[in-house]
């Protein structure tokens, strides 16, 4: 049998010149690394789009490595399962409001199970001038 883990491709940053700018999402990504969180499960979206870039381009998609999920609920459940199997805490990023509401059951399950999950959330662009047409107005 082939080892399937050797065929998994991890997203890696494309080398670019050093940036003159410092982003707030880089600070959040650095904090996740300082906490020694190996993975962060998230459902990608506009709420925290800068964090995606910082995890890949600032941290090289290592510690934490992004695990893309189809739903906020899945992200918390995956983090809970990882913590149970490895005895290490994992992060889950949730969209504010609806994402948090969708994830309430796995958050409750983790609490009942006394399994640590590091949860962060985001709200997206607050400044109306920085919102994209239509999608960030609903």
Indicate residue ranges for each PLM-predicted region.
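N-terminal alpha/beta PP-like core and its mobile active-site loop of ThDP/TPP-dependent enzymes
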Residues: 2-138
């Amino acid at each position: 049998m082939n080892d399937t883990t050797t065929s998994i491709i991890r997203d890696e940053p494309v080398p670019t010149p050093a940036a003159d700018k410092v982003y707030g999402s880089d600070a959040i990504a650095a904090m996740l690394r300082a906490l020694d969180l190996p993975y962060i499960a998230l459902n990608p979206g506009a709420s925290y789009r800068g964090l995606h870039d910082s995890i890949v381009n600032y941290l090289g998609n290592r510690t934490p490595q992004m695990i893309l999920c189809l739903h906020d609920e899945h992200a918390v459940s995956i983090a809970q399962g990882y913590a149970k199997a490895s005895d290490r805490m994992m992060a889950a990023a949730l969209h504010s409001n609806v994402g948090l509401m969708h994830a309430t059951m796995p958050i409750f399950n983790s609490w009942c199970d006394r399994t640590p999950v590091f949860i962060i959330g985001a709200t997206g662009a607050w400044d109306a001038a920085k919102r994209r047409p239509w999608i960030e107005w609903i």
